[in-house]
Amino acid sequence: MTRISTSTENLTDSALDSLVSVKAYIPDNAMSADLLGTERTGHGTRIRNDGLIVTIGYVVNEAEKIWISSRCGKASAGVVIGNDFQSGLALIKPITPLPGPTMALGKSRDLETSDIIRVTTSARDEQQSIDAQVVSKQEFAGRWEYLIEEAIFTAPANKNWSGAALINLEGKLVGIGSLLIQGFEGNDSLCSVNMFVPIDLLTPVIDEICDSGRRLTPERPWLGVLVDEKDGELTIVGIYRNCPADEAGLRPGDKILKVDDRPIYSLGHLFRSIWDLGEAGRKVPLTIMRRSKQQKVCVKSAERSAFLHKGTIQ
């Protein structure tokens, strides 16, 4: 693989000091505890002189306690400034200022397939900072009612992906690490890749999230289901307790056929069809298949944030 030029390597190496490690502790009764665990670790990137850090949301969502550590060995308790459920990113801050530089925000939309980039983490191992290549930019639908249109997929995969910084050749932050995906189809072969959330999804709303803890636009309708897509079928594989889907009587194993009497053909199409109905609180008419019989179920949607443990959020 083509190496980054010496000057760019020096630039990204100096940016290492803007990376921090993040450890979060989540209560046992939090909605996400069973799925994501009660102790989570990841990375964050300092993006403003006031100490503001961006990380992947699932590391700190519902956290009762957050611990942030810089590369120089200093550490501080932290707080969640705000969550952005549309992008899946979160903003946090240390309570006690931690020294270190900031990383400028780049434009993820300028990345192209085959571009060489740098994946950087706060880990102190051989994968702390590695060269990688953009293998694809495409839609990603996550079974937890999550959809982004131009997710960034890179290879080789970094094993420390949660909150990792994706840095372009100018040394600017263009993405935040979210997933490791095995068996990804790219370049006529299957490979392991990391999926990064484009920073462009967060840049326009950073100030309003800092001021309000969230986007100012109304939240999307949320049902509280986990849905898998396989062989053209959309099957509910999990339901959060006491959430709208649970209250409506949906069950794991139900197959979703239609939204508002319109056939659904993919996971991304399912989520768009639900969100197109209006704001959170809107009733969502579903047609499902249960034990070889079609049924109609109406789910009164809600705001996702209303079901989350507030934790350290300011």
Regions found by a protein language model. Name each.
Residues 1-14, 100-101, 119, 169, ...:
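C-terminal cap/linker of serine protease catalytic domains
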Residues 106-110, 164-165, 238, 244-255, ...:
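A short glycine-leucine-enriched loop at secondary-structure breakpoints
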Residues 52-54, 170-174, 245-268:
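Conserved PDZ fold ligand-binding element
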Residues 31-34, 59, 63-65, 100, ...:
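Active-site loop architecture of trypsin-fold serine endopeptidases
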Residues 14-35, 119:
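A short, Trp-centered hydrophobic/proline-enriched beta-strand micro-motif
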Residues 29-37, 81-88, 137-152, 185-187, ...:
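Gly/Ser-enriched beta-turn/beta-hairpin loop segments
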Residues 27-29, 41, 46-128, 151, ...:
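Conserved active-site neighborhood of the chymotrypsin/trypsin-like protease fold
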Residues 79, 207-214, 248-251, 257-259, ...:
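PDZ-domain C-terminal substructure recognizer with occasional recognition of PDZ-binding tails
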